[in-house]
């Protein structure tokens, strides 16, 4: 997988119709920044933040939602606190109120201290991020959630390659399911073709494109986008 260069946001950022903007978001923000971000959240977002048991998780949720508002507000030309969200039946956030007609579509994923956000116009889009954490039952999880040929490929690999391949499969499937709004129950219906040296392709949905990402050491990610012919841009918040 290619390493991409994540650039600082330019002063006058524009999103063209054939672009997908990918944002790398550090969630461990200084306390002063966290307070500013919290001030932009809605009452239901603040209530969600307060339901986290661990303060670290509360802070990271606040940072992720506040920065998402900042990013989307920049494209919409409004203050972060003015951005309105609706939620699909499975809880996927989408733009609501007058912003629903903007054509701006986005998706957010986070793992530990990092989040990724994908934004574009008109194309359905999903993104997933996973840290390569030790998982003792990789093969049993793969047998449950992956197709037989995916499971067999994983089993055939040396032990040191299995973890990364497992999470590459997982992020590609999850990114597509997040884009379509389907739940994790359909993981085993999504076929991904990949090898340790070849990029992933969505066999189940040939009209969709996949891009794998390495946003940080020891993690993998993927973005699924409806259609082809789009250009990725990589920004660091």
Swiss-Prot record:
One of its GO terms (cellular component) is cytosol. It catalyses: apo-[peptidyl-carrier protein] + CoA = holo-[peptidyl-carrier protein] + adenosine 3',5'-bisphosphate + H(+). Its EC number is 2.7.8.-. GO terms for molecular function: holo-[acyl-carrier-protein] synthase activity; magnesium ion binding. It holds the Pfam family AASDHPPT_N. Mg(2+) binds at residues 128, 130, 174. GO terms for biological process: lysine biosynthetic process via aminoadipic acid. Keywords: Magnesium, Metal-binding, Transferase. It comes from the Bacteria. Its cofactor is Mg(2+). PANTHER family: L-AMINOADIPATE-SEMIALDEHYDE DEHYDROGENASE-PHOSPHOPANTETHEINYL TRANSFERASE, PHOSPHOPANTETHEINE TRANSFERASE. Belongs to the P-Pant transferase superfamily. Gsp/Sfp/HetI/AcpT family. Probably activates the acyl carrier protein (ACP) domain of HetM, by transferring the 4'-phosphopantetheinyl moiety of coenzyme A (CoA) to a serine residue. May be required for maintaining vegetative growth and probably acts via HetN to inhibit differentiation. This is 4'-phosphopantetheinyl transferase HetI. It comes from Nostoc sp. (strain PCC 7120 / SAG 25.82 / UTEX 2576). The gene is hetI.
């Amino acid at each position: 997988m290619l390493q991409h260069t994540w650039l600082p946001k330019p002063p006058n950022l524009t999103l063209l119709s054939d672009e997908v903007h990918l944002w790398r978001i550090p969630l461990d923000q200084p306390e002063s920044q966290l307070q500013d971000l919290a001030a932009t959240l809605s009452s239901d977002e603040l209530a969600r933040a307060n339901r986290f048991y661990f303060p670290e998780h509360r802070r990271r949720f606040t940072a992720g939602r506040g920065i998402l508002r900042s990013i989307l507000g920049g494209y919409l030309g409004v203050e972060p606190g003015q951005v309105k969200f609706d939620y699909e039946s499975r809880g996927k956030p989408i733009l609501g109120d007058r912003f629903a007609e903007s054509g701006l579509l986005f998706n957010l994923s986070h793992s530990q201290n990092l989040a990724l956000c994908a934004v574009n116009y008109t194309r359905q889009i999903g993104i997933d991020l996973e840290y390569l954490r030790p998982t003792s039952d990789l093969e049993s999880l793969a047998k449950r959630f992956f197709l037989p040929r995916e499971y067999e490929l994983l089993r055939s690999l040396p032990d040191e390659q299995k973890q990364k391949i497992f999470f590459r499969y997982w992020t590609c499937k999850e990114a597509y399911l997040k884009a379509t709004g389907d739940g994790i129950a359909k993981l085993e219906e999504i076929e991904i073709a990949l090898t340790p040296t070849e990029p992933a392709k969505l066999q189940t949905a040939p009209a969709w494109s996949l891009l794998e990402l390495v946003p940080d050491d020891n993690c993998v990610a993927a973005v699924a986008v409806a259609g082809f012919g789009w250009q990725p841009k990589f920004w660091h918040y």
